[in-house]
Amino acid sequence: MTQSVCILGVTGSIGQSTLKVLAQHPDKYSIYAITAHSRIQELVEICKQFKPKRVVVPDEHIDQLRQLLLQAGLADIDILSGTTGLVSVAQDEAVDVVMAAIVGAAGLLPTLAAVKAGKRVLLANKEALVMSGNIMMQAARDHQALLLPVDSEHNAIFQSLPSNYLTLENTGQPQLGVSRILLTASGGPFLDYPLEQLSEVTPQQACKHPNWSMGQKISVDSATLMNKGLELIEACHLFSISEHFVTVVVHPQSIIHSMVQYIDGSTLAQMGNPDMCTPIAHALAWPDRLQTHVPALDLFTHTHLDFREPDTNKFPALNLARQAMRAGGLSPCILNAANEIAVDAFLKLQIKFTVIPEVIEHVLNHVQNDTAVNIEQVLETDMIARQIAHQYVNQIRG
């Protein structure tokens, strides 16, 4: 019997990698629902190949999609729209596994819906967990959902931890002999750029990641090291550990995906070629394994591995994320909202690269932090933070 899969964000890089893995195992998995924000023609081609039962797009693309599916002889596919549609497919009784791969805050509600429906949730949308934090984790416990990390770093940590670590209560302290998590970072495309040159870098340069193929937003986050900051927050929630016990290590080759240190002096590392199909396959099949097209790591071609401390003077976003996690409450939500607006402004050439952390710091200082009680409060704070960020960006533009 095959497992039924819903892919939230099927046309993005994670969605595409998920399709590659699923296509190798039609005897184990079938695709029940897929969603996309744009790239409608690409979505139709996916429908032709995988024959999903349900598809979700924004309201403005419904007519176009319906016409294209009709022409393709796929008129029986159920078309839904908007956030309501996303939530509907994420919690659908027919779905066993949800790949949460929508980028940014837009993925929060459908991801939370999947968790509350007790699904096996493959978490690629780090922003959803950064925003909701304990609300998401408590929902997973209450509804017995299996929340498995897909980010290569968190998947590596998961593989390097004792097998029952995700079921532990959150004490903030390392448990089961763990002493510290080492979260690796490639350092991004500007790792060796002088500080004085960063103000002139372009979106095109920022989106050229040295090791990974990713979308624009996460590529810019990687360039500012905010991606590592968001991952630090995600790691604290997933693995029930205070930020004090998470060390970021710059590792330019992206061969070691993260490490866990133990009290006996051991350090366990997960290594592999930088290909997202590996963590996706691991999360899909855990505690089993799936074969993928990814070649095994050839250690003889990697003559050395480099490690260094992050330069937080050149990349202040990492410390902003750490401070937000330390502050707790809604601070990570505020950080994420400000970052999304700042990155979008940079991609639209409205602000310089070095202004991104400036926008984030301004918003953190001007939006009231509080304890996150419910998801409505999270969404309201997200909206306010975005408004403040927009205002500051417009002020800078003059």
UniProtKB/Swiss-Prot annotation:
NCBIfam families attached to this UniProt entry: Dxr, PRK05447.1-1, PRK12464.1
A GO MF annotation of the entry reads:
NADPH binding
Q: Does the keyword NADP apply?
A: yes
EC no. given is 1.1.1.267
Keyword vocabulary terms for this entry: Isoprene biosynthesis, Manganese, Metal-binding, NADP, Oxidoreductase
Q: Which reaction does it catalyse?
A: 2-C-methyl-D-erythritol 4-phosphate + NADP(+) = 1-deoxy-D-xylulose 5-phosphate + NADPH + H(+)
Top EC class of this enzyme: oxidoreductase
Where Mn(2+) binds, per the record, is at 151, 153, 231
Role: Catalyzes the NADPH-dependent rearrangement and reduction of 1-deoxy-D-xylulose-5-phosphate (DXP) to 2-C-methyl-D-erythritol 4-phosphate (MEP).
Residues reported in the UniProt entry to bind 1-deoxy-D-xylulose 5-phosphate: 126, 152-153, 186, 209, 222, 227-228, 231
So, what pathway does this thing act in? Isoprenoid biosynthesis; isopentenyl diphosphate biosynthesis via DXP pathway; isopentenyl diphosphate from 1-deoxy-D-xylulose 5-phosphate: step 1/6
Cofactor(s) needed by this chain:
Mg(2+); Mn(2+)
Query: Where, by residue number, does NADPH bind?
Result: 11-14, 125, 127, 215
Q: Name one GO biological process term.
A: isopentenyl diphosphate biosynthetic process, methylerythritol 4-phosphate pathway involved in terpenoid biosynthetic process
Put simply, this protein is called 1-deoxy-D-xylulose 5-phosphate reductoisomerase
Instruction: Please report which protein family the annotation says this sequence is part of.
Output: Belongs to the DXR family.
Q: Which taxonomic lineage is given here? A: Bacteria, Pseudomonadati, Pseudomonadota, Gammaproteobacteria, Moraxellales
